[in-house]
Curated annotation (Swiss-Prot):
The protein's name: NAD(P)H-quinone oxidoreductase chain 4, chloroplastic
Family annotation (InterPro entries): NADH_Q_OxRdtase_chain4, NADH_Q_OxRdtase_chainM/4, NADH_UbQ_OxRdtase, ND/Mrp_TM
Transmembrane helix as UniProt keyword: yes
PANTHER family the UniProt entry points to: NAD(P)H-QUINONE OXIDOREDUCTASE CHAIN 4, CHLOROPLASTIC (PTHR43507:SF21), NADH-UBIQUINONE OXIDOREDUCTASE CHAIN 4 (PTHR43507)
Membrane topology: Multi-pass membrane protein
Taxonomic lineage: Eukaryota, Viridiplantae, Streptophyta, Embryophyta, Tracheophyta
One Pfam match: Proton_antipo_M
Organism of origin: Dioscorea elephantipes (Elephant's foot yam)
Protein EC: 7.1.1.-
Length: 501
């Protein structure tokens, strides 16, 4: 369905246009840049919500609000945008988390004009990726993330920020090489006229060997970004050094771009190769849950421990994608949204806590539950959500992924039993390291022995950010159909095309 008004173009271009306009603002302190960026993000979120509420039809699994503008004649490159039930959830998540991340970044005072400019550029790249319907445009939006994240890390990070930023750019740029090769290979294959249109590529058939090569190239790029072991080692270092508002964007949105690409391109455009790779995805996802949960115990740095838990939770998404069932795939999408909220909240609360107590290592913390009861309450609540407490979004997402792999007709009974058993062990390890982390932070009397120690509890701004994230976590946990209703028709379409192609 083609849109006569360029709603998606406005949504994609507005943040980057506002970012370029930030240079014309008068420099009258950081307050001007804070309010300007927050208002732009809030306007973008409200505009996105309006467009989806009044111009998007849930019962239509076809691409909606489609826009098509030819940009380069030689290579058939189009500014081609469109959304469906698969992309609407990540787009709303992006707007929600980015708006709250700008509020979380208010304590940033050094070169705040550039800081907020980079956040707005990231915003455009993320929205553009989730709404792109052209393979080269997808790659451009994918790359648009790299430079802002690198600068946010290298300029506003911790003591080892340059090492972490360099490691991040090397990993992600290396993965992007494989992504570019796959994009060019699929676009140029088998036709005198190259095509990068998702719709035409979905009907393209390839020799099995070539499809496997394309699939593997895309998989490497997504394995770096998601991340999937063993290409995950950049993540703990990056989260350990980044400012917590940057961590919110990384954990809430950036990691989900890889999982989205795995569904949108690998599963939708390369189904035969995905059928061959799916058992390996399930195996790697299962190992990832156990491995990341186990290594989390050895992390003394608070944010690095939460980063390892993010890697562990991404394993459920990989398993859901590899299950090749509508239940498992719905669970993977629900986990994408659920962990986007929970991961962003945990990094926000850990960052605000570390700013107050001036410690980042768990063995230096202790006894802050009494002087900071609000932070203690919110952090404990999100820890419960992360360990899949019933009534919260994490529980529903992991349960649906469990059901998806158990009911998958692709796997035999014994492998399914073994996989679910190992997943259950991972779910047992999760509360162990999360509750251990909470005990080291909030209980004991270590910090009370510090002379003249005084800690300020969460203020109105931080409490507002925490509650805003907590509400959808509870809402999805109580009524998950609000997410399933967006994606269920599209997933059925992907799987029907997948099996009958």
């Amino acid at each position: 369905m083609t849109s006569y008004f360029p709603w998606l173009t406005i949504i994609v271009v507005l943040p980057i246009f506002a970012a370029s306009s930030i240079f014309f603002l008068p420099h009258k302190g950081n307050k001007v840049f804070r309010w300007y960026t927050t208002c732009i993000c809030l306007t973008e979120l409200l505009l996105t919500t309006y467009v989806f509420c009044y111009h998007f039809q849930l019962d239509d699994q076809l691409i909606q609000l489609e826009e098509d503008l030819k940009c380069i004649n030689i290579f058939d490159f189009h500014w081609r945008l469109g959304i469906d039930g698969l992309s609407i959830g990540p787009i709303l998540l992006t707007g929600f988390i980015t708006t709250l991340a700008t509020l979380a970044a208010w304590p940033v005072t050094r070169n705040s004009r550039l800081f907020y400019l980079l956040m707005l550029v990231m915003y455009s790249g993320q929205i553009g990726l989730f709404s792109s319907r052209d393979l080269l445009l997808f790659f451009i939006m994918w790359e648009l993330e790299l430079i802002p994240v690198y600068l946010l890390l290298s300029m506003w990070g911790g003591k080892k920020r340059l090492y972490s930023a360099t490691k991040f750019i090397l990993y992600t740029a290396g993965g992007s090489v494989f992504l570019l090769i796959g994009v060019l290979g699929m676009g140029l294959y088998g036709s005198n006229e190259p095509t990068l249109d998702f719709e035409r590529l979905a009907n393209q058939s390839y020799p099995v060997a070539l499809e496997i090569i394309f699939y593997f190239g895309f998989l490497i790029a997504y394995a770096v970004k998601s991340p999937i072991i063993p290409l995950h080692t950049w993540l703990p270092d990056t989260h350990g050094e980044a400012h917590y508002s940057t961590c919110m964007l990384l954990a809430g949105i950036l990691l989900k771009m890889g999982a989205y690409g795995l569904i949108r391109i690998n599963m939708e455009l390369l189904p035969h190769a995905h059928s061959l790779f799916s058992p390996w995805l399930v195996i790697v996802g299962t190992i990832q849950i156990i491995y990341a949960a186990s290594t989390s115990f050895g992390q003394r740095n608070l944010k690095k421990r939460i980063a390892c838990s993010s890697v562990s939770h991404m394993g459920f998404i990989i398993i859901g994608i590899g299950s090749i069932t509508d239940t498992g795939l719905n669970g993977a999408i629900l986990q994408i949204l659920s962990h986007g909220f929970i991961g962003a909240a945990l990094f926000f609360l850990s960052g605000t806590s570390c700013d107050r107590i001036r410690f980042v290592y768990l063995d230096e913390m202790g006894g802050i539950s009494l002087p900071m009861p609000k932070i203690f309450t919110m952090f404990s609540s999100f820890s419960m959500a992360s360990l899949a407490l019933p009534g919260m979004s994490g529980f529903v997402a992991e349960l649906v992924v469990f059901l998806g792999i158990i009911t998958s007709p692709k796997y035999l009974l014994m492998p399914k039993i073994l996989i679910t058993f190992v997943m259950a062990i991972g779910m047992i390890l999760t509360p162990i390291y999360l509750l251990s982390m909470s005990r080291q932070m909030f209980y004991g009397y270590k910090l009370f022995n510090v002379p003249n120690s005084f800690f300020v509890d969460s203020g109105p701004r931080e409490l507002f950010v925490s509650i805003c994230i907590f509400l959808p976590v509870i809402g999805i946990g109580i009524y998950p159909d609000c997410v399933f209703s967006l994606s269920v028709d599209k997933i059925e379409g992907i799987l029907s095309n997948y099996f009958h192609r």
